[in-house]
Amino acid sequence: MHPNVYIPEAFLEKIQTILPAHLNMEDFIASCQKPLRKSIRVNTLKISVEAFLERAEAKGWKLSPVPWCNTGFWIEADESVVPLGNTAEHMSGLFYIQEASSMMPVSALFMNDESYDAVLDTAAAPGSKTTQIAALMNNEGVLVANEYAASRVKVLHANIERCGVRNAALSNFDGRVFGGWLPEQFDAVLLDAPCSGEGTVRKDEDAMKNWTQSSVVEIADTQKDLIESAFHALKPGGVMVYSTCTLSTEENQQVCHHLKETFGDAVEFESLKDLFENAEAALTEEGFLHIFPQVYDCEGFFVARIRKLTAVEAPKVKKRMGKFPFSKASNKESAEIAKQLQNTMDIKVPEDSTVWIREKDVWLFPDALEPMIGELRFSRMGIKIAEAHKNGYRWQHQVATALATGDEKNAIELTIEEAREWYMGRDVRPQNIPADMKTGKGEVFVKYEGAIIGLGKWVSNRIKNGLPRELVRDKNLF
């Protein structure tokens, strides 16, 4: 795929000095020039792995399991007519296109089938790991998904929405603020740190065009600040995973050792030798995974699992929050909203969520978020479920993506032609209307092959399209 991939000579000389004895440079260079296998992760918030495998087989997709992620698969699929990203399964959130090695940090975070109430994803966009965490949390507790680059928060939200995540709170800060603003708040923290990207040449032949040793050192300084802040944000007894898609020891082992030197006995490295079969092929003496691309035929990657054994003194910070624009709904309001949602949409408000109001907008926040409200300014929290109007509530798209299952009484199955029309933003006139379904007025879920794809409104014998404009596609659909 990339026989002419650019690899600086100075970088190759550096790799020669850190390559483990059982590996060789010829294989390293050959693997960098080899095409990266495409991989996907099944989104178990929407579908079981077993049900997805049946759908994949029917489509002629060949899947082989990723050993470190029981929902991850390498995929061989004919994309000459329809790219994977334009398949109905992808658009309805049944799977996420995710590089196999990037599934490993989240698997390490949940290595022992842990259950966490509060998780921080420090550098979250575009959302592959965030949605993976949400699935392992089963949409319970709270997941704070932070992204420093404002331009990427929109993409992060789009992926969270598509995948049916409802326990997330999004923020847009430099990751270095969390230790001071939310000290010892999280049961688990993922720090997938910004890095020099030395492991990504199989995906991007120009990834190393601007590589210099001085830039590696500069990035490592930022990573040390980030890992300190992440450690401060972690509760005593909590677990942090530090990961990068780079190979240099300055950005990997040395960052972890910096944490140990800074906080001493409060830091414990936990071995990842049992994370998956043959993990020892990439294991360092500390128990980290330092993955060169030829070992598992994937991107270069680094993963460390770290436990915080004792509390540490939080940094002193000043912060100005401004007025919080939401108010908690009264018991009466909450009961009325829950009643109408049940009566009109056959949906129950989740027990671990609370209704909050901002002007006419109605939101559901995860209960586990409440201790953080007023401590950090979030750009988006939970899911928007309705807008209040004089005649009741107008339900929103996230009721379909995050709350509906497809088994609701007012969910109607579309044909493939109708589903294509729907994704192109057009109203549909369904051919197959169940005899017991009331038509003519009211809101209705639409689904395709059993998966919910949106929320519309009956207008006579047609369903008015309620797809948000940013989700409308115009061609090349399944």
UniProtKB/Swiss-Prot annotation:
One of its GO terms (biological process) is rRNA base methylation. Belongs to the class I-like SAM-binding methyltransferase superfamily. RsmB/NOP family. CDD domains: AdoMet_MTases. The active site is at 245 (nucleophile). S-adenosyl-L-methionine binds at residues 123-129, 147, 174, 192. This is Ribosomal RNA small subunit methyltransferase F. Specifically methylates the cytosine at position 1407 (m5C1407) of 16S rRNA. It is found in: Cytoplasm. One of its GO terms (cellular component) is cytoplasm. Gene3D superfamilies: 3.10.450.720, Vaccinia Virus protein VP39. It catalyses: cytidine(1407) in 16S rRNA + S-adenosyl-L-methionine = 5-methylcytidine(1407) in 16S rRNA + S-adenosyl-L-homocysteine + H(+). One of its GO terms (molecular function) is RNA binding. Keywords: Cytoplasm, Methyltransferase, RNA-binding, rRNA processing, S-adenosyl-L-methionine, Transferase. It holds the Pfam family Methyltr_RsmB-F. Its main location: cytoplasm. Its EC number is 2.1.1.178. The keyword tRNA processing does not apply. The lineage of its organism: Bacteria, Pseudomonadati, Pseudomonadota, Gammaproteobacteria, Vibrionales.
